[in-house]
From Swiss-Prot:
Domain of life: Eukaryota
Organism whose genome encodes this protein: Epinephelus coioides (Orange-spotted grouper)
InterPro entries referenced in this protein's UniProt entry, alphabetically: Calycin, Fatty_acid-bd, ILBP
SUPFAM superfamilies cross-referenced by the UniProt entry: Lipocalins
GO cellular component: cytoplasm
Any Pfam family hit: Lipocalin_7
Chief location of this protein within or outside the cell: cytoplasm
GO molecular function: lipid binding
Intracellular or extracellular location(s): Cytoplasm
Designated name of the protein: Fatty acid-binding protein, liver-type
Keyword entries, A-Z: Cytoplasm, Lipid-binding, Transport
Length: 127
């Protein structure tokens, strides 16, 4: 299955605690918790472009599976990491955050991020 497509956030778990743990200010946490972000994924072999739009904030990351890339984190910082593919999962570690994005079925993406013992999960559906 291909990741390519546009997905809208449907649900999320542990949003506030995770955002606090990564250092986002309360004002941004409150502002962002009710916004349904849109993720657009373009996949061409091992090359990916991921655009995440949350309100007026847009994060664009491009990477090639297995090669080091500079990626923008949720806090807006840039960090180098290597994205690995494991079947229908993309995995990366950035600044201590472990991220796994799984194509659950043809229409659903689950993204789980973990920092220490604090986890965050978001489910997005294809639109």
């Amino acid at each position: 299955m291909l990741f390519s497509g546009k997905y809208q956030l449907e649900s999320q778990e542990n949003f506030e605690a995770f955002r606090k743990a990564i250092g986002l200010p309360d004002e941004l946490i409150q502002k962002g918790k009710d916004i349904k972000s849109i993720s657009e994924i373009e996949e061409n072999g091992d090359d990916f472009k991921v655009t995440i739009t949350t309100g007026s904030k847009v994060i664009v990351n491009t990477f090639t599976v297995g090669k080091e890339a500079e990626l923008e984190t949720l806090t807006g910082e840039k960090a180098k990491g290597v994205v690995h593919r494991d079947g229908n999962k993309l995995k990366v570690s950035l600044k201590g955050i472990e991220s796994v994005t799984e194509l659950v079925d043809g229409n659903t993406i689950a993204n789980t991020m973990t920092l220490g013992n604090i986890g965050y999960k978001r489910i997005s559906k294809r639109v």
